[in-house]
């Protein structure tokens, strides 16, 4: 019987109940895989990526022992979106001027002229 792949997809976060093998997602109910900013809307530093990964690990740990459902994955994804917004507002993260579509999905950049 094939395993069901659960997923959460938000604007900047994708979470799958899968592992990556040869660039393919293989369903795995015991593992969550995080795909961060698939459209490359932001410029990421290693420290910001680590901060997101740490928050992801905290959220997963807080749901340990609970039901693995679409709803719980969406809660984790929404929390990560909020973390991304906070990082952007704090100036730790910035929009990528080279992205395919620059739509400022999390609000206009904070610049001295706009403050």
Swiss-Prot record:
Cellular localization per UniProt: Cellular thylakoid membrane
Key words of the record: Membrane, NAD, NADP, Plastoquinone, Quinone, Thylakoid, Translocase, Transport
GO molecular function, one term: oxidoreductase activity, acting on NAD(P)H, quinone or similar compound as acceptor
InterPro entries xref list: NdhM
Membrane topology reported for the UniProt record: Peripheral membrane protein
EC number: 7.1.1.-
Primary subcellular site in the record, as a coarse category: membrane
Lineage: superkingdom: Bacteria
GO cellular component term of the entry, any: plasma membrane-derived thylakoid membrane
Catalytic activity from the UniProt record: a plastoquinone + NADH + (n+1) H(+)(in) = a plastoquinol + NAD(+) + n H(+)(out); a plastoquinone + NADPH + (n+1) H(+)(in) = a plastoquinol + NADP(+) + n H(+)(out)
Pfam family, one: NdhM
Subunit (UniProt): NDH-1 can be composed of about 15 different subunits; different subcomplexes with different compositions have been identified which probably have different functions.
General function of this protein: NDH-1 shuttles electrons from an unknown electron donor, via FMN and iron-sulfur (Fe-S) centers, to quinones in the respiratory and/or the photosynthetic chain. The immediate electron acceptor for the enzyme in this species is believed to be plastoquinone. Couples the redox reaction to proton translocation, and thus conserves the redox energy in a proton gradient. Cyanobacterial NDH-1 also plays a role in inorganic carbon-concentration.
Family classification: Belongs to the complex I NdhM subunit family.
HAMAP family listed in its UniProt record: NDH1_NDH1M
Protein name: NAD(P)H-quinone oxidoreductase subunit M
